[in-house]
Amino acid sequence: MVEVEHWNTLRLRIYIGENDKWEGRPLYKVIVEKLREMGIAGATVYRGIYGFGKKSRVHSSDVIRLSTDLPIIVEVVDRGHNIEKVVNVIKPMIKDGMITVEPTIVLWVGTQEEIKKFEEDAIAERQ
């Protein structure tokens, strides 16, 4: 049986368009670089194949209907205080999109040594 502990971890999702830019560069790349600079645990970028946003315009990767602005999701899981810092830095970059944050439970991350350090940090954080 897996023992689940609350480590105050959050999942941050940033929903943007593939064509969104920041200072002329793809926004999703700028965000990931900024996350890395900030020492965030990790980030993954997902490219949507079909979807629509608040304007109800459908974006599709179908060959027949090739969209040039597919949905992009940047996902991050880290401790709450790190996610809060990220939101404060990233939010001004988002001109059209959505940011969500939700609690998440991390069951496994990395090597045994990394897990031990993660657990020790979580315990110290509570004190």
From Swiss-Prot:
Source organism, top-level taxon: Archaea
InterPro entries referenced in this protein's UniProt entry, alphabetically: N-reg_PII-like_a/b, N-reg_PII/ATP_PRibTrfase_C, UPF0166
Gene3D superfamilies: 3.30.70.120
SUPFAM superfamilies: GlnB-like
Pfam families in the record: DUF190
Database matches in PANTHER family: UPF0166 PROTEIN TM_0021
Family label: Belongs to the UPF0166 family.
Protein name as it appears in the record: UPF0166 protein PH1503
Organism: Pyrococcus horikoshii (strain ATCC 700860 / DSM 12428 / JCM 9974 / NBRC 100139 / OT-3)
